[in-house]
């Protein structure tokens, strides 16, 4: 991110972080109450 700003944890409630064994795997976006949209490479 170039020129980005820090934000409060509650400002972007649709963003998701997927972790496994304390390591960040991928990011995602909530598209409704039950579904998270991720990139295809996150499934590996």
Swiss-Prot record:
Localization per record: Secreted
Gene3D superfamilies hit by this protein: Trypsin-like serine proteases
Sequence similarity: Belongs to the peptidase S1 family. Snake venom subfamily.
The keyword Disulfide bond appears for this protein: yes
Tissue/organ expression: Expressed by the venom gland.
GO biological process, one term: proteolysis
UniProt KW Iron-sulfur keyword: no
Entry's Gene Ontology cellular component terms: extracellular space
Domain (Peptidase S1): residue spans on this chain: 1-44
Disulfide bridge partners, by residue number: 26-42
Protein name from the UniProt record: Thrombin-like enzyme F202
UniProt GO MF annotations: serine-type endopeptidase activity; toxin activity
First-tier enzyme category under EC: hydrolase
Modified how: Contains 6 disulfide bonds.
EC number from the UniProt entry: 3.4.21.-
Keyword terms: Blood coagulation cascade activating toxin, Disulfide bond, Fibrinogenolytic toxin, Hemostasis impairing toxin, Hydrolase, Platelet aggregation activating toxin, Protease, Secreted, Serine protease, Toxin
Subunit structure: Monomer.
């Amino acid at each position: 991110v170039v020129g980005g700003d820090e934000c409060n944890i509650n400002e972007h409630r649709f963003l998701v972080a997927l972790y496994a064994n304390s390591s960040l795997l991928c990011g995602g976006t909530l598209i409704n109450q039950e579904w998270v949209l991720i990139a295809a490479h996150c499934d590996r």
